[in-house]
């Protein structure tokens, strides 16, 4: 059963009639007073390794007589580096869709003949934007990669700050990586690690590069949704987020299947130069790639061989092979759907499409979500992928 039911959301959001946005900057709600208005919001949240971005457009802050912006009215909302939280919904019900910091401020005065009005545009990024802006070469205290990821994240003051209610501004949800012994404390906690000289190192890389490297090494995902930062096993939660059919607020839909680049197997290998020993592992695809029998023979003998000099065991080669096989398999199916605005739709989860007909009916893994809101409308656009033909 899916986590959310469209009928329940329709009732909760009062038939999706009156879009509502709440923007909180440094703990203070941006209020529509003195003419200042949030005229539009665009939020793009990604389940990939990229940073998520939000754009907030403010109007009602320009004096036509003096032809200047009333900075006194807006100053408290314009500080770059300020924390920002965006909630979207309808009527009296809203849900958080973005959390990050103000990275850029633009003042825009359009051509006087245009219908557009002068506005201030706030461009915001999630914390990944900060993790990209450094570079280190150092030996960490942690022995295992999940602990090392936690160590790096906890060193970031923006991540570790408290919100206006005294809670954590960012919650770290970190699964243990396979290099950590079973039975060790979860959540990336260091616990009581054995005394050993083995420690994880960062070499000429940013915090972001290091975490992405660790994610690819063990077939993990690294993304942020609202207040939660995830470093977790890829696609482990297969419970659908929501089931959608053509009668559930559909605006636009594009579904496609493409066998280009698919392979039957992935091989990851390396040579231990000291011992002259072969290290490697092989995985085979189990995906159903066609409704007929024409495509399978074309892929059957195709393989991807990847040389990984960092692999020092069959198990590690298997983790990298799983990451590569997962990446290839999920090239098969793609979806771009636009529905009535639903803040519950997030990346990193599966959405089930039903009653569209075969092969459109399928479980798609959401990779990107874009929420678009004006004072009159709210829509949610999502992109997703699938590793098998629709059923």
Where are these regions (language model features)?
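Charged- and aromatic-enriched interaction segments used to assemble
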Residues: 116-249
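Assembly/oligomerization scaffold segments
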Residues: 1-134
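Short, compositionally biased
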Residues: 99-108, 235-238, 364-375
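Surface loops and adjacent helix of pleckstrin homology
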Residues: 89, 234, 271
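Compositionally biased, intrinsically disordered low-complexity segments enriched in polar/Pro/Gly
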Residues: 1-13, 219, 240-241, 245-254, ...
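Extracytoplasmic/secreted envelope proteins and their assembly/folding machinery
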Residues: 99, 146-150, 208-212, 265-266, ...
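An acidic/polar, Gly/Ser/Thr-rich interaction patch typically located in mid-to-C-terminal regions
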Residues: 49-76, 249-391
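Short hydrophobic/aromatic-rich beta-strand segments that constitute the beta-sheet cores
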Residues: 86, 231-232, 268
């Amino acid at each position: 059963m899916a986590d959310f039911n469209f009928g329940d959301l329709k009732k909760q959001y009062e038939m999706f009639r009156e879009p509502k946005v709440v923007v909180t900057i440094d703990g203070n709600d941006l209020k529509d007073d003195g003419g200042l208005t949030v005229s539009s919001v665009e939020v793009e949240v990604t389940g990939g390794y990229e940073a998520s971005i939000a754009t907030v457009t403010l109007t009602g802050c320009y004096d036509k007589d003096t032809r200047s912006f009333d900075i006194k009215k807006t100053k408290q909302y314009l500080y770059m580096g300020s924390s920002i939280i965006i909630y979207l919904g309808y009527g009296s019900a809203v849900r958080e869709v973005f959390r990050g910091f103000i990275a850029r401020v633009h003042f825009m005065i359009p051509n006087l003949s245009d219908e557009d009005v002068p506005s201030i545009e706030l461009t915001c990024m999630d914390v990944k934007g900060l993790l990209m802006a450094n570079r280190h070469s150092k030996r960490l205290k942690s022995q295992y990669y999940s602990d090392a990821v936690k160590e790096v994240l906890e060193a970031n003051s923006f991540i570790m700050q408290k919100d206006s209610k005294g809670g954590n501004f960012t919650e770290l949800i970190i699964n243990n990586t396979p290099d950590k012994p079973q039975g060790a404390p979860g959540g990336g906690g260091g616990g009581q690690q054995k005394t050993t000289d083995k420690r994880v190192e960062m070499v000429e890389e940013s915090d972001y590069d290091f975490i992405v490297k660790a994610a690819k090494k063990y077939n993990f995902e690294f993304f942020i949704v609202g207040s939660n930062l995830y470093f977790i096993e890829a696609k482990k939660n297969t419970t659908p987020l929501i089931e959608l059919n053509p009668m559930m607020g559909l605006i636009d839909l594009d579904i496609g299947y493409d066998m280009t680049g698919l392979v039957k197997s992935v091989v990851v290998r390396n040579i231990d130069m000291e011992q002259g020993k072969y290290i490697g592992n092989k995985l085979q695809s189990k995906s159903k790639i066609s409704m007929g029998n024409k495509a399978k023979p074309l892929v059957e003998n195709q393989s991807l061989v990847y040389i990984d000099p960092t692999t020092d065991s069959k198990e590690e080669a298997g983790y990298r092979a799983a990451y590569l096989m997962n990446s290839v398999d999920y090239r098969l199916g793609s979806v771009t759907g636009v529905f009535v605005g639903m803040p519950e739709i997030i990346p990193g989860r599966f959405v089930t499409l039903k009653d569209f007909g075969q092969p459109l009916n399928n479980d798609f893994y959401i990779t990107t979500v874009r929420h678009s809101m004006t004072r009159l409308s709210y829509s949610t656009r999502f992109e997703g992928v699938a590793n098998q033909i629709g059923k």
